[in-house]
Amino acid sequence: VSLIAASIAGGDLTAASLAWGAAAGVAGGIAVWWFYLALANGPMSVVSPVTAVVVAGIPVLVGIATGDRPGLLAYLGIVVAVIAVGLVSRESDETVTGVGHPRFTSRIAWWTVGSGIAFALSFIGLGQVGTGTGLWPLASSRATATLVVWLVIAFSWRAVVWPVRSLLPILIGIGAIDVIANGALLFAYQHGLLSLVSVIAALYPAVTVLLAVIVLGERVSRVKLLGLLAAGVAVALVSLPG
């Protein structure tokens, strides 16, 4: 899907942009692997918000350290956004495990923080891509991320649960949406500050919760509702001048 989109969008094929895209893809593939390992073996109520806050925080620090200078309101928005990410990402352990409280062991902590760092590095990698390169860096990113996934599958072949054929159209649709979302993110990085784009992108759990309420009619906890409100405030603050 990403190759088709890149061919249609055009743009310059440069070694640097493809390399940054490839690096972002490797980091993203590792991030997804470790994140689901942590979710499968640890308490989601800890794993999810910790990962989300790490993902939101590291690119902000890197962006500011490398020259980003957001305005005062944007700085306030960044702080509110990081808090919002933690709130909307929080889940009860029973939601996923159906049991009490899995232990947050040192191995789970490594997977949790490691996945957050890897996601953040993926954001930072995309943020280094120059303008005029179209979606080719995204195609490069998806290629290396897919390679990581297949390597993981190869080393855990007996434990793999393959999707049924009836899910294929849904999976293709998800792939197309993923390309659209990440293409938009790539263009946002090319025309915005790493710190601001990353922290807004990290608010995606808020959109997931909002869609669950609107489309599925789910009820949200007070904590998540507070997180949704904080996310709205954060976006408004980052968008305002000064």
Residue map of PLM features:
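Juxtamembrane helix-loop-helix junctions in multi-pass membrane proteins
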Residues: 1, 11, 120-145, 196-199
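Membrane-interface interhelical linkers
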Residues: 1-23, 35-42, 92-110, 144-173, ...
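Alpha-helical transmembrane segments of compact multi-pass small-molecule transporters, enriched
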Residues: 1-2, 50-64, 144-148, 181-185, ...
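Hydrophobic transmembrane alpha-helices of multi-pass small-molecule transport proteins
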Residues: 2-3, 57-61, 72-92, 223-242
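C-terminal transmembrane-helix exit sites in multi-pass transporters
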Residues: 9-10, 56-76, 86, 152-156, ...
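Hydrophobic residues within alpha-helical transmembrane segments
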Residues: 19-26, 50-54, 76-79, 110, ...
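Glycine-/small-residue-enriched transmembrane alpha-helix faces in small-molecule transporters
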Residues: 30, 86, 97-136, 173-177, ...
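Structural motif at transmembrane-helix junctions in multi-pass transporters
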Residues: 34-50, 130-137, 184-203, 219
